Swiss-Prot record:
Domain AB hydrolase-1: 23-244
Disulphides: none
Assembly, per entry: Monomer.
Matches recorded under SUPFAM superfamilies: alpha/beta-Hydrolases
Gene designation: bioH
Upper classification of the organism: Bacteria, Pseudomonadati, Pseudomonadota, Gammaproteobacteria, Alteromonadales
Binding-site residues, substrate: 29, 87-88, 150-154, 241
Primary location class: cytoplasm
Protein name, as recorded: Pimeloyl-[acyl-carrier protein] methyl ester esterase
Gene3D superfamilies: alpha/beta hydrolase (3.40.50.1820)
Pathways involved: Cofactor biosynthesis; biotin biosynthesis
Protein family: Belongs to the AB hydrolase superfamily. Carboxylesterase BioH family.
GO cellular component, as recorded: cytoplasm; membrane
Catalytic reaction(s) noted: 6-carboxyhexanoyl-[ACP] methyl ester + H2O = 6-carboxyhexanoyl-[ACP] + methanol + H(+)
Length: 264
């Protein structure tokens, strides 16, 4: 479906498939919801809403910050859904769970961090500032090449990196390239957003999936995250930043039993 909203709220492209509890899937920076195509059949027991984030894929850009994006998504998606976000999408889903707890029944973050930027003064592991700066500078020069480089970094470390990059690229390029302003918005979010002080507000069941070989969200993030009875961590030993591509079977083994709690 395409979520049509009042004229002042731009259109979001949402591809809804399957039957069952509502599950929202949010992609990462530089790509679109087509990256989740391999999961369509595997998640058919859920009513899955594959969302193109604002300015990505077939969605129109939405000016503003992370909160603006979250507000637009909340208005376009069913209440009482499970929200799953990969990378930047995980940041969006986390903010949504914090701001709209009654709308979100459960949270899944995949290779995602509440604070993507490395903070040396706090010994917080993350992306070195110069890496995000480099991508920001390259955006104005060669958009397709910049996205391809980013895809390569996401697969780095995986034993099947070459195949992973090709699969990601083929899926992503089936839709229009992202809007340049949306890419800058996304980089700013990765650069500036720090949700760590607000994580205690998340009381919904929360599944966090990590890749031990992830070059963007280092494995050292996980031990520094809050723990509680409603939180489950799964570290995939041989996965990098795109575990649902490189290790789909292990990824599904992590999410399938966890999702089952919402079927009753």
């Amino acid at each position: 479906m395409n979520a049509t909203t009042p004229a002042h709220r731009p259109q979001l492209h949402i591809d809804t498939r399957g039957q069952g509890p509502d599950l929202v899937m949010l992609h990462g920076w530089g790509v679109n919801s087509a990256v989740f195509t391999p999961l369509h059949e595997q998640l058919s027991e859920y009513r899955v809403h594959y969302v193109d984030l604002p300015g990505f894929g077939l969605s129109q850009p939405i000016a503003g910050d992370l909160s603006t994006w979250v507000d637009a998504l909340i208005h376009a998606l069913p209440a009482n859904a499970i929200w799953a976000g990969w990378s930047l999408g995980g940041l969006v889903a986390t903010q949504a769970a914090i701001r709209y707890p009654s709308h979100i029944q459960g949270l899944i973050t995949i290779a995602s961090s509440p604070c993507f930027m490395a903070r040396e003064e706090e010994a917080w592991p993350g992306i070195p500032p110069q890496v995000l700066s480099m991508f920001g500078e390259q955006l104005g020069q060669n958009l397709p090449k910049t996205i391809e480089r980013f895809l390569a970094i996401q697969a780095m470390g995986s034993e099947t990196a070459k195949d992973d990059i090709k699969q990601l690229r083929d899926l992503v390029l089936a839709r229009p390239l992202p809007d340049a302003a949306a890419l800058t918005q996304g980089l700013d979010m990765l650069n500036q957003i720090d949700l760590r002080p607000q994580l205690s507000a998340i009381q919904q069941p929360w599944l966090r999936i990590w890749g031990r070989l992830d070059g963007l969200v280092p494995k050292r993030v996980q031990p520094q995250m809050p723990t509680a009875n409603h939180i489950t961590d799964v570290m995939l030993a041989k996965a990098s930043h795109a575990p649902f591509v490189s290790h789909m079977e292990e990824f599904l083994q992590a999410i399938t039993p966890w999702l089952a709690q919402f079927k009753d």
